[in-house]
Amino acid sequence: MPFKVKVDILDLNIRTGAGTDYAKTGEHTGKGEFTIVEVKAGKGSAAGWGRLKSGAGWISLDYATRLA
């Protein structure tokens, strides 16, 4: 089930897959609220990786706060 997260850093990398072993897309989230549609465990993030609804890629949930 999709959920929203808040990102408070400007330069959170978006990656092509769920882990630091996947390439960076060259894009960053910026600060704001984003919808996560899938979560997977992966290298480099204790909280897991979230797939952005926009289709842009995956972000580390270590740097995102889940919203109610």
Range-by-range predicted roles:
Residues 27-63:
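SH3/SH3-like beta-barrel superfamily modules
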Residues 2-13, 17, 37, 59-62:
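Catalytic cores of transferase enzymes with a strong primary signal for eukaryotic protein kinases
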Residues 1-13, 26-30, 45, 50, ...:
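SH3-family beta-barrel domains
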Residues 18-24:
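Short alpha-helix capping/helix-loop boundary micro-motifs
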